[in-house]
Regions:
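Glycine-centered flexible beta-alpha turn that most often forms the glycine-rich phosphate-binding loop
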Residues: 21
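Conserved core segment of the aminotransferase class I/II
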Residues: 42-108
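Active-site pre-lysine segment of PLP-dependent enzymes
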Residues: 1-15, 24-55, 68-69
Length: 109
């Protein structure tokens, strides 16, 4: 953990953006999940990527990004150029699941 804190200090000092791809961050066989880099980032330098394919349904290929708005706008543009959009049905199903059930409790199962 000490090394991670030092890493955050360095990227903060030099304002280096970091992409944290964390598909397995919520999955643990025992103990608490480890904190993400994003949770320790005070300057908004860490761009966090997550996926529903590991915690809900492997076939969905549906994820999310946590970043500042100016970065998200660029991500959206690149995504639209690359593949237009993810499956609308998958997006609706995941949205309904999140609305109806506690996603954190589902992940703990």
């Amino acid at each position: 953990m000490k090394d991670v804190k030092k890493f955050i200090e360095i990227i903060s000092k030099y304002e280096i953006p970091v992409l944290e791809d964390n598909p397995y961050g919520e999955l643990r066989f025992k103990g608490e999940s480890l904190p993400s880099l994003k949770s320790m980032d005070k300057k908004g330098l860490v761009i966090f990527l997550g996926t529903f394919s590991k915690i809900l349904c492997p076939g969905y290929r549906l994820g999310w990004t946590c970043a500042y708005q100016n970065i998200l706008k660029k991500f959206i543009f690149v995504k639209q150029v690359a593949d237009l959009q993810a499956s609308s049905i998958s997006q609706i199903e995941v949205s309904k699941f999140i609305d109806l059930y506690n996603l954190d409790n589902h992940v703990k199962k």
